[in-house]
C-alpha cells in the first residue's frame, strides 16, 4: 500500500469472539480510556424486547457508552446481512464525522464477513414468492419442497435438512426469482462497492485456550438469565399473535428452547440442558469462523487478565502499531 493510499484509509478496530468470551467487558474497559462508540455485530441484539436472552448491554452500560445497531428491529420483522452492512458502514462514517472512534464488537461472523468482504448478488426477499412457498409447504410439507429444491439446486439441498423451512424457502425463492441455483450465485465472487474502500478492518479475537472454561461460563450465564426472568420475557413474546418459531428472531439461541418449554414440549430441566447445549454449539460455530480468519490478533479469553490484554490489543490497532 502506498503512503498516499495508507493515509486515506481509516483503521477500524473489531472485537470479535464467541458467546461468553468477555467482549462487553473489554469494550467497556476500552471506552473508559478512549472516546469510542460501540457498533454491535450481533444478529440477536437487533431485536427489540429480547433483552435477557440475548445478554443485551444494560441501560446503564448503554447510557455510559453510545451503542449502535441494538433494538432496531421488531422481532416479527426480518433483518439481513445486507441490511447490517449498509447500517454499519453508515454508522461508522457518522461516528468518525463526530470525531469519535468506532469499535465493532460482536460474534455474528456472517455479518462481519458481509461487512468486510462484500455480498453475493442475491435478490431481496419477495413477499409474494414466500407466500406461495408457504402455502405449498402447508399443503405438501417442507420435505416435499426440499425434494423440489434437490431437483434444481442439488448442492444447496444436500447441506440442508428436509425440515429446515427458512433455508429451503430462501433457496427456492432465489431460484424462482433468478432462474439460477443459489449455490451458483454464492460461488461467484462477492459484489463489493466503494463504501468500505476507505476502511481497514482489523479483528481482535477473544478465543479460549480451554473450552471447558468457556462452557462453564455459558452454563453459568444461562442460569443467570433464567434467574433474571428469561422465561417471563419469552412468555411476553409468545403472547403476541404475530410471532412464531419459524421467525429468525425466535430461532435465536435459548428462545426456541424456552418457547418449547412454555408450550409443554419439554420440562424445565430439559429446556435448560437444551439451551446450554445450543449455546455451546453456537460457540463452536463462532470459533470455526474465527480460526479461519488468518489476520486476526488472538487474545486468550480464559486468561485472568483477558480484559486488559484485549484493551491493549485494541489500542495497538487504533494507534497503528500493527502490521498493515
Swiss-Prot record:
EC number per UniProt: 2.5.1.75
Gene3D superfamilies xref list: 1.10.20.140, P-loop containing nucleotide triphosphate hydrolases
Similarity comment: Belongs to the IPP transferase family.
Native species: Burkholderia thailandensis (strain ATCC 700388 / DSM 13276 / CCUG 48851 / CIP 106301 / E264)
Pfam families: IPPT (PF01715)
Protein name (database record): tRNA dimethylallyltransferase
HAMAP family: IPP_trans
Any single GO BP term: tRNA modification
SUPFAM superfamilies: P-loop containing nucleoside triphosphate hydrolases
Gene Ontology molecular function, alphabetical: ATP binding; tRNA dimethylallyltransferase activity
Residue spans crossing the bilayer: none
Region (Interaction with substrate tRNA): 42-45, 166-170, 251-256
Keyword Cytoplasm: no
Positions that bind ATP: 17-24
Function as written in the Swiss-Prot or TrEMBL entry: Catalyzes the transfer of a dimethylallyl group onto the adenine at position 37 in tRNAs that read codons beginning with uridine, leading to the formation of N6-(dimethylallyl)adenosine (i(6)A).
Site residues by UniProt (Interaction with substrate tRNA): 108, 130
Complex formation: Monomer.
Amino acid at each position: 500500500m502506498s503512503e498516499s493510499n495508507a493515509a486515506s484509509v481509516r483503521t477500524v478496530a473489531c472485537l470479535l469472539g464467541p458467546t461468553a468470551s468477555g467482549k462487553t467487558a473489554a469494550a467497556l474497559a476500552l471506552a473508559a480510556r478512549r472516546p469510542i462508540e460501540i457498533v454491535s455485530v450481533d444478529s440477536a441484539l437487533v431485536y427489540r424486547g429480547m433483552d435477557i436472552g440475548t445478554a443485551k448491554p444494560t441501560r446503564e452500560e448503554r447510557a455510559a457508552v453510545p451503542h449502535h445497531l441494538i433494538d432496531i428491529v421488531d422481532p416479527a420483522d426480518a433483518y439481513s446481512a445486507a441490511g447490517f452492512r449498509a447500517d454499519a458502514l453508515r454508522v461508522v462514517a457518522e461516528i468518525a464525522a463526530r470525531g469519535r472512534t468506532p469499535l465493532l464488537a460482536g460474534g455474528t461472523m456472517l455479518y462481519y464477513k458481509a461487512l468486510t468482504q462484500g455480498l453475493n448478488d442475491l435478490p431481496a426477499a419477495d413477499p409474494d414468492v414466500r407466500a406461495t412457498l408457504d402455502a405449498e409447504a402447508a399443503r405438501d410439507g417442507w420435505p416435499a419442497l426440499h425434494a423440489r429444491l434437490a431437483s434444481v439446486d442439488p448442492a444447496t439441498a444436500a447441506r440442508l435438512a428436509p425440515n429446515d423451512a427458512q433455508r429451503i424457502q430462501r433457496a427456492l425463492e432465489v431460484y424462482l426469482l433468478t432462474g439460477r441455483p443459489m449455490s451458483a450465485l454464492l460461488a461467484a465472487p462477492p459484489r463489493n462497492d466503494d463504501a468500505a474502500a476507505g476502511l481497514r478492518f482489523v479483528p481482535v479475537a477473544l478465543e479460549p485456550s480451554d473450552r471447558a472454561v468457556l462452557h462453564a461460563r455459558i452454563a453459568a450465564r444461562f442460569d443467570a438469565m433464567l434467574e433474571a426472568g428469561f422465561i417471563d420475557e419469552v412468555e411476553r413474546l409468545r403472547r403476541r399473535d404475530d410471532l412464531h418459531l419459524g421467525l429468525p428472531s425466535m430461532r435465536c439461541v435459548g428462545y426456541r428452547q424456552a418457547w418449547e418449554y412454555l408450550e409443554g414440549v419439554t420440562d424445565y430441566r430439559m429446556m435448560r440442558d437444551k439451551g446450554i447445549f445450543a449455546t455451546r454449539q453456537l460457540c463452536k460455530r463462532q470459533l470455526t469462523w474465527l480460526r479461519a480468519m488468518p489476520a486476526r490478533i488472538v487474545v486468550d479469553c480464559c486468561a485472568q487478565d483477558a480484559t486488559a490484554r484485549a484493551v491493549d490489543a485494541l489500542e495497538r490497532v487504533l494507534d497503528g502499531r500493527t502490521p498493515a
